[in-house]
Amino acid sequence: MFNERIFSVGITKFQINNFDNQTLCKQVEYFCTNPHNKTVNKRDMGLDNPHLIELNKVILQQSQLILNGLTSNPNVEVYLQRVWGNHNVNENICSPHVHRESFLSAVYYPKSTDGRIQFYSPFTDAILSHVPVIADKYHEFNSSQHTVYPKTGWLILFPANLLHVVLPSKEERHSIVYDIGVKLI
């Protein structure tokens, strides 16, 4: 086992209890109504959407906390680049992907009972490709992936360039996804 950690990849996840998830689900469904238009830009929910004001505030606050933990530069701040909704669009988000041109991504789940998002390590496959891994317990040094099982009301923030995939779900799932940038002030 290694005795020192030199690099790390973090995510933030927590439960939010005071949002009107029913209204947020209706908003997601409204912006995902065309079954032939599954591209992100066609599902844009609008950063100025009045139903997203409180969620936008939480996303900005949590994103700024992450940025502040990475740098002591007082001249940078986060901003919301775009927001879109997903409503059981399993076929479009089941390929591993990253969110290019962004600092962070955030996903809020106004409804999720069997949702799964899987993150892939940017490091471990390089070393594990030389070792047949049989492990009694998986940990950060011998795992090439990490699965999160979000429930209704969960918010997850992660580096936008972290490779991830949303695994298919059998039950109804709604999510609101943000890309977050950084700018000089």
Report each predicted region and the residues it spans:
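Non-heme Fe(II)/2-oxoglutarate
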Residues: M1-V76, W84-N86, I93
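Karyopherin-beta/Importin-beta family HEAT-repeat alpha-solenoid scaffold
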Residues: F2-E4, I156, V165-V166
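Short beta-strand His + acidic residue motifs that chelate non-heme Fe in jelly-roll/DSBH
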Residues: C94-H97, H164-K170
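Short peripheral tails and domain-boundary helices/loops at the edges of structured domains
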Residues: D179-I185
